[in-house]
Design a protein with these regions (language model features):
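Positively charged N-terminal leader segments that act as targeting/secretion signals
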Residues: 3-19
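Conserved PDZ fold ligand-binding element
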Residues: 50-70
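PDZ-domain C-terminal substructure recognizer with occasional recognition of PDZ-binding tails
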Residues: 76-111
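Basic, Lys/Arg-rich alpha-helical nucleic-acid-recognition elements, primarily the DNA-binding modules
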Residues: 43, 57, 75
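PDZ/PDZ-like groove recognition
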Residues: 37-45
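Conserved Radical SAM active-site core
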Residues: 94, 103-247, 254-260
Length: 260
């Protein structure tokens, strides 16, 4: 089946066996559900498959194996095959290259940013937000509130799912991406209240969708005494337990001052 190797690669990575290779493969340049149909190549590794195919910095990557490239998720998924057909544009003309390489090997192209676009920021205002509690005067990057499912897959970040769409979730399922989810509570009304986001409760359905599709989700609960503990915590744990073995949960207790 076409792209079976790519799918196999994603399964290997999602099971945690990609390790060092995953970092080397993905660190250069994932998934917004947006149809960005091309991306500029900013560099090419020496002696790489792309270099051998005479792909150059300044070329525009159009497609891989007939698939338009929206971001690095597409890039790594479709480039995993041992036979890779790459279409680039140079000086207004499209140029097709057929590249033979070891299965899963990176093509060796570099892009303008880690994600090929902007990070998705957090749209919540959680009552216990750790970033809001950080002291001033630290490096600026520490104050950025990311909520990007791509970084969850690549770096292990936790995401709330509140800025994802059904299309995003289907793509996660199709590509077999195991991600980490900040749950906090499975009570929709309480989740909206804790996260100050009116969509937070509805997005809980994505957890069930992903778990029932066979993905493994690492979940966390920031337990705030008097708010989502007691009966609410028992409800949350019971709901998550019903999705075992596809749910792995961690319990983190926040200090009381966090939400006063």
């Amino acid at each position: 089946m076409k792209n079976s190797g790519a799918l196999k690669a994603f399964k290997v990575f999602s099971m945690g066996r990609g390790g060092k290779f995953l970092l080397c493969f993905f660190i250069k340049s994932i998934f917004k559900g947006v149809a960005k149909m091309s991306v500029k190549v900013t560099g090419v590794d020496k002696h790489s498959p792309a270099a051998r195919a005479r792909i150059k910095a300044g070329d525009t990557l159009i497609s891989i194996n007939g698939h338009a490239i929206a971001d690095v998720l597409d890039y790594m998924f479709y480039a995993a095959e041992d036979r890779t057909e790459v279409v680039c544009e140079r000086d207004g003309k499209e140029r097709k290259s057929v590249i033979y390489k070891s299965e899963y090997d990176d093509l060796g192209m570099q892009f303008d940013s880690f994600l090929m676009d902007q990070k998705r920021s957090c749209s919540n205002k959680c009552i216990f937000c750790f970033i809001d509690q950080m002291p001033p005067g630290m490096r600026e990057t520490l104050y950025f509130k990311d909520d990007d499912a791509r970084l969850s897959f690549l770096q292990g970040n936790y995401v709330t799912l509140t800025n994802l769409t059904d299309k995003d979730i289907q793509r996660i399922i199709d590509m077999r991406l195991n991600i980490n989810v900040s749950v906090h509570t499975t009570n929709p009304e309480l989740r909206c209240k804790m996260m100050h986001n009116r969509f937070a409760g509805d997005k809980l359905r994505y957890i069930k969708m992903m778990a029932e599709s066979g993905l493994m989700l690492n979940c966390q609960i920031v337990c705030c005494p008097g708010i989502n503990d007691g009966d609410e915590l028992r409800r949350t744990l019971t709901d998550l337990y019903s999705l075992m073995p596809n749910i792995q949960s961690g319990l983190h207790c926040a200090p009381k001052a966090s939400w006063l």
